[in-house]
Amino acid sequence: MASCCIFCAQFVLNRNLLEANKYKLSEITFKVYISIRRLLIVVITLYRRIVECCASLCSLIFSKYYLHYKTFRILTIIQSWSDKVSVLPNRLYCLPFCNAFIEFVKKLTET
């Protein structure tokens, strides 16, 4: 979920001021909009780091007491491979939500 939120925030942030003008956003509204997006990215990234840190700590404790080192390494390699494979489906899954969010912002700014 966190990776989806980060992807959406980055997707929106990557749009430049010309596209913002296309959506008829004023400069002040655009700056507020970008500030909120940046804050969202910081919060979600922080949350993600905490979760990753806790997961690493749990894995380390688990491996120390229950798993042989080689077994732990194999599990780690499988996990990192599955994370890389899941990036593309995650982006395909997130994209409609990003587009829906942009449409929502366009409707808000039309008034």
Curated annotation (Swiss-Prot):
Keywords: Cytoplasm, Nucleus. GO terms for cellular component: cytosol; nucleus. It is found in: Cytoplasm; Nucleus. The keyword Cytoplasm applies. Its main location: cytoplasm. This is Putative uncharacterized protein C13G1.15c. It comes from Schizosaccharomyces pombe (strain 972 / ATCC 24843) (Fission yeast).
